[in-house]
Amino acid sequence: SYTPGSTFKIVTSISALQNIGSDVYSRKWQCDKVYDVDGIEEDNIICNARHGKVDFETALAKSCNITFSQIAIEIGPEKLANTVESLGLTSSVTVSGQINSAKGKFYLKAGDPDATTGWTGIGQGQTLVCPAAMLRLMCAIANDGKAVPFNVVDRFENQAGKTIKFTRDTKETQLLSSDIASQMKDLMRNNVKTQYGDNKYKGLNLCAKSGTAQIDNVDAHNTAWFVGFMDDDENPYAFVVVAEKGNSGSQTAGPMAKKVLQAIVNGTY
């Protein structure tokens, strides 16, 4: 499991839609690059740019730390934790009914200070997410809120080479409402149209979010994420790319995703 960086803003967005509702679209937040949460300089939340006044959709596309830290604080630790739990991000993912992934970690709890809540809401701090759980969430957003089980194993064999019977899991799990899934699909599509560039991902009809998790103060040590799916009935594929020591999500993990997805669409994989 890895620090999710700004991919966690997908989770904070879902929680905002669940707890604040549609009013979140009509509001604006002021980003002056630095947010003084509590008067303690070390707790200041820093943004990647001075965005000025931004709405919800623009804040996600520009990955505004100030906006999403303030949204997380407004939602509160308990409700944000409930969203994380309901999306399955602290649970292991079972593959082919037999293999369990690592579990995620989410430590935010009632009574935690605003600074901790704010940093958590933008995917920094102690939160850890397993790529398999993030992939399951991407599948759910693309699939009307329903997550499908993962089956990647054709068969199991014992030491004698005999096939062991196992039952494939086919049960879908409703992780979020179809309405919120649809809204998240639109928001993630807007990320690509307005920020990453449809021209860079031509023909993919991509819905995505990048993330750059800062492990220390060295960019080369960052964990780079690029997550999402193709909104395409002929190529209904979700993806998660995680690059350890990857510098930047959009610059490192994004091109990796593009190469694989284009190979799928072009039939050259």
Annotate each language-model stretch with its function:
Residues 1-5, 11-245:
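Beta-lactam-recognizing serine transpeptidase/beta-lactamase-like catalytic domain environment
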Residues 134, 249-258:
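Short, charged, low-complexity patches
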Residues 163-164, 168, 256-269:
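Short, gly/Ser/Thr-rich active-site loops of penicillin-recognizing serine hydrolases
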